[in-house]
């Protein structure tokens, strides 16, 4: 149902993002990155391109507005997301996960590049790891995001002592 792309090797990412075939773009399609949210909010307000009521995006926090755009899209389709967690709090990542799960069950597909252990935890996700061994399937518990988060939560004091030494 879902493919999550993880990793940060530039050469692998460049190859993964190469467009081999151009597809028709629907009237409500757009490219959304957390970094370009302000520009999109301005365009949505000015052109009212079928985004629903987006007139208040500039009045919202960055994360709330970003989530509003994501939640306003409910139609079946293929959704490509590049690190959507970068604009979202932990709680709002859970909101996005719930939304994606419902949409996937209704026939939508997602391809997501993420480092979020929350988004990687989506039930039935097919997780692909991009690392020095190439691209390969990876179990949730074997992702760096999950393992590092687990170590931090379970062993925070000792990890901080190791990282910060006498500075603590």
Residue ranges and their predicted role:
Residues 15-25, 52-54, 90, 95-104:
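Catalytic phosphate/metal-binding cores of nucleic-acid and nucleotide-processing enzymes, i.e., regions
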Residues 10-11, 33, 113:
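Hydrophobic beta-strand positions within the nucleotide-binding domains of ABC ATPases
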Residues 13-31, 153-157, 161-164, 168:
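Extended, highly charged alpha-helical segments
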Residues 1-7, 11-12:
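Single conserved hydrophobic/aromatic residue that forms the stacking wall/gate
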